[in-house]
Amino acid sequence: LSERVPELKMYVIGETKSRSFNDMDLSLYKKESRIKFLGRVSDVQLVKLYSNACAFIFPSFYEGFGIPVLEAQACGCPVISSNTSSLPEVLLDSAILCEPTDIQGMAKSMVTLVKEENMRNEYIRKGFINVARFDWESSCKMISDKLKCFAIS
């Protein structure tokens, strides 16, 4: 990725004490000036990071719902996500979906989003449309409709 887009920087947000990072020697990456481990950030910082990012990569194996991908989309950030658990249903066609272990596929998708502005803008547009499905009014109506179906049965 650094060869194809040398100006690209990667910010890892969140705790690095999880088992996902257990077998990694993070000190090797901390020397790399293009990779920054930010740890937990405030909501204000998170919005700023999403808003200024080329893309948000979310390689999750297990995800209950996927709020981070919706947060990124709400900030106008294209999403590259796993094709596992609830994420395909939450994202539909508004994101690029990859196997969570397909690092090359994610890197290729990132290069595409950086180099092809029209495609990037299309994913931003689709992201805004997708997020609108999850506003409070729509969510309440969906729950109400489901409860009515159960009451009738």
Residue ranges and their predicted role:
Residues L1-S153:
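Carbohydrate transferase catalytic cores enriched for Leloir-type hexosyltransferases
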